[in-house]
Amino acid sequence: MIPASPDAAADDWLQWRGPLGTGISEETGVPQKWSQTENIRWKVKLDGEGNSSPIVVDSKVFITHAPTGSAQRELRCYDRSDGTLLWTKGAEYSEKEITHQTNPLCASSPVSDGERIVAWFGSAGLYCFDLNGEQRWKVETGKVDHIWGYGSSPIIYQNLVLLNFGPGVNSYVAAFSMKDGAEVWRRTFPEQVSSKHEEYRGSWSTPVMMRQGNSETLLLSMPDRLWAVSPLTGEDRWSCGGLSKLLYTSPLIAGDVVVSMAGYNGPAIAVRAEGTGDLTDTKRVWLHEKGNPQRVGSGVVVGEHLYILNEPGIAWCIHVPTGEITWKERLDGASSWSSMTAVDGHLQVNTMKGSTILLQANPTACQVIGINELGEMTRATPAYSNGQIFIRTYQHLYCIEESQ
């Protein structure tokens, strides 16, 4: 059982966390050293803060963006060769939209099938554009109503856009047609919906696809429970309990084991993805109930080990088959919301103070091999494509490349 296979070219970075949404890149030759004066191909000024991450489609780089003080929700397209802004499209949403100061609007990353781009603008709706910026369709998805805003990114499976809408009183998961935006299925999970004033319940988790035998399964980290459903119909396949009310990270896949990690000091679970129905008592491999940190960024699995940088800036390595924590280490004295990526034989992850930490995927000891400073706040996750790294900070979008 493995992550579902992508249909697009390996060099493109078509969604948050890369081709499979797992934080694993096949890129080689990416820079290992950079700063404001080294290996910067270009940088462009951004007129608004944001937590969403860039994606790369052929010669174009895309981000979602909300200009400071504006009602606009934007999808921006840049030329990857020099950072020229090619076009800006989106929507105007003049109603008040609740979010938190740490989570600016347009927090969801776009996704592409290589021909079209889909962006979720929260209460402003779900939009689809072609690569030239022509709008193909839009869907009114409802109003997001949660004190901390939204953050899950849409993903594409076959001809469907899959969206974890929420958190808040209107939460649901749905599939929409890539052709015209028509709703194919929608469902709400029992624990997913919070009351009007329930701050500490909800899922900001981006779903992940997993191949099981000859079929593929949609994995969803939801309050209290990890769910596996059919991406085509939304019907249950299996679930596993043991989580808490707040979920930020995406599920992680290690062979036939799926790991889901709650946020806000909540538990982590691992379940063997075999069978149907409630697998809590029969297939749950381990449960970490105590001593858990706040987790916002997702980890990455290399071999049998999971590596993650938690929000307080403490990295963990976990042996997935047993749940043993093989090491913990505070890194660079900075907190992080960014997700970790395995690329070119090592690990990379951003911190909020604008550094990117490089580590060896060493299961026996924390081994930092480099720290690169840009010195600007970031909560986004880098994109990797054709030897280049794209980093979105609160001030700029960067293209990082080895100098010739």
Label every model-predicted segment:
Residues 1-3:
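Bacterial N-terminal signal peptides
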